């Protein structure tokens, strides 16, 4: 179901792309996957205050390219680029290959699901009321162009004894629609009462596919195959020859007799009656009473 499954994984083959893009055979796949997880955990701890939205890992031939999407690129780069150089050395040591690190700026962090979740968890750790933090984030997202947003918080909210779950939604969030561009992010708040989990769904509109445009091509083909339908039945005129009179009009009387004007006959037969010559049988001459022959 669309409400239960991860929205990113649900749309991977349609409108989303993978966050790790490389190929490995069966022997090397597990090791490379473990390296990716290790790198992501390291960047999560190292760049905790840099507002990192997502990390893209690519592995061309015997190299690695890591793209970091951040709302605060200056924190990642550091003074005169010192921090990013140290980051490259550490990542190269972990992966064992040369690493190129690229920084991409997130223009609107208010409508990025991961950054919204991180912002709410930071406020929860500062003992701000969870309802106030959630509603403020929703207002900012809708104000900056999001078509819909849903936020869910789970755990010992406000320090209550029994954990519960609360969620709020504004706008529309169509999780079942595959062409819908749904941004999904999660985060955890480490509070004195325990962990509070935050999930965020942001609806940004419909998309026509990934960067290669395969989704747009599929939609165009489907539209061409769809044949146009004719007008509605009640919009057609009622004076067609193969149809009767309009609805509500008086009907002509029916009977077994033929019409007097010959309208039931073909046009040629009806017109031929005017030029026909009537045949009159000539009567035989009457015989004489005395039986004599007349000349």
Curated annotation (Swiss-Prot):
InterPro entries: KH_dom, KH_dom-like_a/b, KH_dom_type_2, KH_sf_prok-type, Ribosomal_S3_C_sf, Ribosomal_uS3_bac-typ, Ribosomal_uS3_C, Ribosomal_uS3_CS. GO terms for biological process: translation. CDD domains: KH-II_30S_S3. Residues 224-245 have a biased composition (Basic and acidic residues). Residues 246-255, 283-295 have a biased composition (Low complexity). Residues 213-295 are annotated as: Disordered. PROSITE patterns: KH_TYPE_2 (PS50823), RIBOSOMAL_S3 (PS00548). GO terms for molecular function: mRNA binding; rRNA binding; structural constituent of ribosome. SUPFAM superfamilies: Prokaryotic type KH domain (KH-domain type II), Ribosomal protein S3 C-terminal domain. Residues 39-107 form the KH type-2 domain. Pfam families: KH_2, Ribosomal_S3_C. Keywords: Ribonucleoprotein, Ribosomal protein, RNA-binding, rRNA-binding. One of its GO terms (cellular component) is cytosolic small ribosomal subunit. Belongs to the universal ribosomal protein uS3 family. Part of the 30S ribosomal subunit. Forms a tight complex with proteins S10 and S14. Binds the lower part of the 30S subunit head. Binds mRNA in the 70S ribosome, positioning it for translation. NCBIfam families: rpsC_bact. This is Small ribosomal subunit protein uS3. The lineage of its organism: Bacteria, Pseudomonadati, Pseudomonadota, Betaproteobacteria, Burkholderiales.
